[in-house]
């Protein structure tokens, strides 16, 4: 598709779609809780729809009523062996978390994904789940999908130190641990997003978080809840950056989830000189509205414990850095290489093709700014965040056109992205 270029100031108010991480977990926990769980504000992107379809195939009744998702949970014992292969589409979250959940079920299942998901390593969940007594295997020593899993009704608790910072691996182990008899401990390398821990407790589960150590004694039963999903900060990030780098812009981003394990991007942009104001902050619900205006920015260093708190925002932060004065250095982000694409390489190649000055490193990028961006032929490579980053970059282009292939990937997390973009350009 041909992207909008040479945009004037962006003006207006955006209600970003529901948080993807919380939407997945609301469906997963609701499916094994006892009773009727109702979810408001659910993200209806393709990844979450993959999770919903998987649980329908596992015998859970899920339907939409009055703009809510209603899940009829029957407890952990209520899942039934699927008649077909579980297709997770492009969703690594679905595959890893549901594999953890199915670890304690007395049946076997085959899990597949699309071409992109089939290139993402599952060894990170295979090894701890095997230690718990699950028969699980993928292709090659990296355990690429498809995954074959035979659950075990007598799961063993484990103490497991995560070799990488990964909320998905932590979550897979905790979902299995809810069905294991005894004490499971997970020790994190760096603290990652904690939605699974918070939501297990919201559904009546018990666990103890002590710094980087999470302790859960199983087995446990969960109770149905009413869940309201806040707006996704990872989706809001695209408008946050657009407002900061397009001269004359002023945007209000409403109802954005600001769980502290996800707010790394806000700390980074403020350090770079961003003018942002928080309005209607609700600390208990961890939501706020964010007012953002065009700002002159300076380069910064992003590394260490900050990385897991903004891992999904790094592509759009890279674009931001191309417009900042000086050098921005992103380190300790090797996890980007095994996302939907090798995001270090794809971000570097895409933005450099438009005139940026970025050097890829083994674990990050060195970005020199400010640079003028020009037209180019680009692709999402099937990665939603690359697509949205490119669409925001195109707004800065004064000369030439920007063409984007495989734009349908954006449906993964933000089905109304282009509609919202047009509205902000015209408001």
Curated annotation (Swiss-Prot):
Keywords: Amino-acid biosynthesis, Aromatic amino acid biosynthesis, Cytoplasm, Transferase. Transmembrane segments: none annotated. It catalyses: 3-phosphoshikimate + phosphoenolpyruvate = 5-O-(1-carboxyvinyl)-3-phosphoshikimate + phosphate. The active site is at residue 312. Pathway: Metabolic intermediate biosynthesis; chorismate biosynthesis; chorismate from D-erythrose 4-phosphate and phosphoenolpyruvate: step 6/7. Disulfide bonds: none annotated. One of its GO terms (molecular function) is 3-phosphoshikimate 1-carboxyvinyltransferase activity. 3-phosphoshikimate binds at residues 20-21, 25, 166, 168, 312, 339. The keyword Amino-acid biosynthesis applies. It is an enzyme of class 2 (transferase). The keyword Repeat does not apply. InterPro entries: Enolpyruvate_Tfrase_dom, Enolpyruvate_Tfrase_sf, EPSP_synthase, EPSP_synthase_CS, RNA3'P_cycl/enolpyr_Trfase_a/b. Its EC number is 2.5.1.19. One of its GO terms (cellular component) is cytoplasm. Coiled coil: none annotated. It is found in: Cytoplasm. Phosphoenolpyruvate binds at residues 20, 92, 120, 168, 343, 385. It comes from the Bacteria. Catalyzes the transfer of the enolpyruvyl moiety of phosphoenolpyruvate (PEP) to the 5-hydroxyl of shikimate-3-phosphate (S3P) to produce enolpyruvyl shikimate-3-phosphate and inorganic phosphate. NCBIfam families: aroA (TIGR01356). This is 3-phosphoshikimate 1-carboxyvinyltransferase. It comes from Streptococcus pyogenes serotype M4 (strain MGAS10750). The gene is aroA.
